[in-house]
Amino acid sequence: MIVTNNRVYAKYNNQDLVNDAISRFPKEARDFNLFLADYQSFGDYLNYGNNKEILFNFKELKFDNEGMPKVKYGEGYYYNPVTLAQYSLAVYGEYLKGENTKENFLKIADKLLTLQDSRGGFLYNFQWRYYLNNYDYKPGWVSGMAQGQALSVLARAYKITGNKKYLEAGNKALNFLITPISKGGVMANLGSLSSSLKNNIIFEEYISDVPTYTLNGFMFSLLGLYDWANVDDSNKKNTAEKYFNEGIKSLTQILKYYDIGGFTCYDLGYITKNREKPHIAVNYHGVHIYLLNALYSITNDRVLYDYYKLWKAYVDTTEVDRISGVNRYETNANISKEFTKEGINTIILASGENYADALSAVPLASKNQCPILLGESNSINSFTINEIKRLNPNKIIVIGGEGAISQKVCNDIKKTNKSIVFERIGGKDRYETSYLISSKIDSKEAFLVYGNNYADTLSIATISAIKGIPILLTQEKYIPNPIKNYIDENTQIDKYYIIGGNGVISEKIESQIENTERIGGKDRYETNTKVLNRFIDELDLSKVYMAIGGPSNMDYADALSCVPLAAISKSPILLVPTTRQIPKSVTDFAYDNLQNNTNIIAIGGKAILPNYKINSIIPEK
């Protein structure tokens, strides 16, 4: 089957719309977890057999004298091909459990056949209006969903009877499903989304003058194709498999459009018909989740799994372990409280307003087995001063010059404890400060990192702390003089790790240093995971911290604060952006290396790092 590598991101975002849907979801949606199952063509369809009473609202159904369900539309009750198909699949599931329902299943399947016309289409013989149209469908309308669900019924009916009528009906149903709308069928293309997608197919649940691309109906039709591809006696099985694969390819291309940043929409009418906002049918978010799970179990396609996990996490109410505060300084102080419950000899005080000097201090904090507290340039906030009082250190190492942490701040701290000794490590710029700090670290290895962005430094910070490796800051195209001096003075260094791609540290720099190894990705998040994979043997993956890694220049503080704490347990820090997108490199690392019992701890508040981001990367399979 097809595996793709699309990235997960929200095409549309309206937080009020999302919040309303999430608040309604527990009351309006079925428990989608009941329908989560690895899919088998001749097995219990989506666990319907175990959940018939939950699947159907029997108050809206009326059963005829033969026990066939009818649904009310307008003033009358009618046979709906989808309702008949789903009810028969539930009865089939009961049969698989050992109940005496085989004949009832076949009776419903036969009733379904009475709705099939000579072309192979299953007809809705009642008038109905789709909310996006300004006209009614006349009796005899068709849909891709009905075709797909009928194929799932007919595949099972033929499997347990060998009766050719089901085989013939299924082949006709398949032919109708893959017939273009322009020729009277239900197959469309995705050209209304993008000209680049005009060759991608989709099976429309509701035929309209402008395609609307209803998601659940499309996925149900794909299950039908998969089922028919597994009917050995069908001369159409290869055709079914071909269109299933093409449909999966389309699905992976368009899932991003249904993600509105915290919930899913029902269709894409908000794009194709230029509607003001997406249409949300709250219960169908759960349907999307269990259909994606079923299709992933068939294809092993990572894109499907990524969206399954993400959409499931959107409505996961499970709280996650979290260390946070009202701002970066309280978060920093709370992390320090986790670092040690008692007093401590030394602490490091670095700028909470500028990342350069603070990040260079990571291996020094590890050497002194102490936390890094964050301060402001000309004042000391209450969270930091109270934590200093609690820790009652003998010594404070101030990182950076007076532009980073002023003498006034030191004097204010001194007022709380006159016995505190201050040591300042600060050069005329970030490169000299990096040199001065690194000169205090004994190591045979060093990290060389771009000095004008914190992202790559955050990626190696935990490894730097665990292994005691100094962090040297450099320019993109030349090595600053203080760092040149370090390289010349420290001949014991036998390996320099260059962090980041050629766009941040040039090949020219690499050529000037012996014994280098470059670790870099296409962005900061891939670099982060490549670093973690490179040093995976140094890490204990039973606990993982997750923090924001950008894109703002101020998004470094929580991850930096966490480094000394993470180093104690040799835990990695996974970086994610503040945007809703979860980079593929992050999910790949999580799914490949973490377990479903891994303790993932969020660093920072829910506003910047919501629960769903953590829950979405916890592996299930």
Q: Whereabouts are the PLM-identified features?
A:
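Sec-dependent signal peptide cleavage junction
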Residues: 2-12
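Structural helix-adjacent loops and short alpha-helical linkers that scaffold large soluble proteins
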Residues: 11-19, 93-107, 157-172, 226-246, ...
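Long, well-ordered core segments of solenoidal/helical folds
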Residues: 13-74, 102-123, 167-198, 240-264, ...
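Acidic/His metal-coordination segments adjacent to aromatic residues that form catalytic metal sites
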Residues: 69-73, 128-138, 195-211, 266-275
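Well-ordered alpha-helical segments within folded domains of soluble proteins
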Residues: 80-95, 141-158, 212-229, 279-297
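Hydrophobic alpha-helical segments and helix pairs
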Residues: 120-177
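Long, repeat-rich segments with strong aromatic
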Residues: 229-232, 236-286, 290-306, 310-317
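Extracellular glycan-binding segments that recognize GlcNAc-based cell-wall polysaccharides
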Residues: 318-621
